[in-house]
From Swiss-Prot:
Annotated residues for binding of ATP: R58, T71, W430
One annotated GO molecular function: ATP binding
Active site: D62
Gene: pafA
Keywords (A to Z) from UniProt: ATP-binding, Ligase, Magnesium, Metal-binding, Nucleotide-binding, Ubl conjugation pathway
Family: Belongs to the Pup ligase/Pup deamidase family. Pup-conjugating enzyme subfamily.
Entry EC no(s): 6.3.1.19
Pathway: Protein degradation; proteasomal Pup-dependent pathway; Protein modification; protein pupylation
Designated name of the protein: Pup--protein ligase
GO biological process: modification-dependent protein catabolic process; proteasomal protein catabolic process; protein pupylation
NCBIfam families cross-referenced by the UniProt entry: pupylate_PafA (TIGR03686)
Name of a matching Pfam family: Pup_ligase
Other facts: The reaction mechanism probably proceeds via the activation of Pup by phosphorylation of its C-terminal glutamate, which is then subject to nucleophilic attack by the substrate lysine, resulting in an isopeptide bond and the release of phosphate as a good leaving group.
Amino acid sequence: MTDADRARRIFGLETEYGVQHWNPEGRPLSPEEVVRYLFRPVVEWGRSSNVFVANGSRLYLDVGSHPEYATAECSTLDELIASDGAGDLLLHDLVVQAEERMAADGVGGRIHLYRNNADSSGSSYGSHENYLLRRRTEYRRLTEALVPFLVSRQILVGAGRVVPAGTWPEGEGPAHFAFSQRADFVQDGVSSSTTRSRPIINTRDEPHADASEYRRLHVIVGDTNLSEHTHLLRFGATDLLLRMIEAGFPLGDRVVAHPTRAVRQISHDLTGTARIALREGEASALELQEHYLERARAFVAAEGAHHDRVGEILTLWGEVLDAVRTGDRSRIEDRIDWAIKLRLLEDYRARHDLGWDAPRLAQLDLAFHDIDPDRGLFRLLLRRGAVARLLPEDAARSAVETAPPTTRARVRADFVARARERGLDYAVDWTTLKLTDHPLHAIVTKDPFDTSSAAVDRLFGRIA
């Protein structure tokens, strides 16, 4: 690893998609039946429902028949956002193929895939962030310092949710709009489980890299985002917090006494002023985030910006906090997910004189997350220019076939392409590349910053 690599970080994002079949003329298919249609082309070419695709990312079926896409390793936020967008395009292409096969089988209706975190039956599915850390960082100190930030971060980057009546975390209450989709399903602060307890941070130590040098921070409290700017703020602000912790930059003692209670309290208070208990005293989400922003600005002033989007991240961070504090969301309604959705629903409520308990609002909430470019409400707003873009319009489409050029994903994608060109069976995972007929020549790629591999060249040269 070079000095330049030490200034970078590997990022990754895992997205689980909600599945629904709508059939007005017959029985709707179960999620299990839908994903069998959806993944049939994947199984045909990959011989499995768990594959690595052309851009180095992973596509597979998760628990509960949820399609999941895990981005390739990325070392810039632009790479991450583009790679994540490529997942939506890949899955939408599978939807189109699945509906054609269904029609040929005499099955009507449409398949919907949603980038959201909760369904009407009370199930939740996640959006998991991955950050590569240096092994020397004291993990207990890092997680203790990070939890208050993550608990309150939802006022910046929550996806927004229409909460039905009677589902307040601390008792009964009317239907209302909340910051987060995921908050009410969080059951623990820090845990090694991702499904049984749904913690804020998962502690399972699987670095997918040299374990003597790295570990992976796995954050699972976040909502699935749609806006590129919200992605930028989510990962950019968290990266800044991690850099401050790693550098020993003073953040103050702000330990949340009851993280799961706090994350729910904050989600249901759009003013950002609800008081949550700390180990010493109390604070609001606004106060916590204002403190972290002030610390981040001081850190950047002292150490310099480590990439060219840092200034943009700090500015947007401040703008969102101003919007929460004042209630004037006009400056962020084209970039921040919860504010984009809230404006859409508030406008609809006003036109039709509806309360938050109106079934139509719950339907619009769901449709907001549909990845179909012609049916998803967020996609329609984006196409009309009501939502701002961060990257060029073709960035995600380009990332469907192209791996991030700055990481090990490039090696993996090249290996897969060369094997398929030659009609060779292969098996790959995050760190291992293997041709089935040459099992003794498996290649291990432990450095996530490697962008080329002499071992891969030698292997294919040997069998040319």
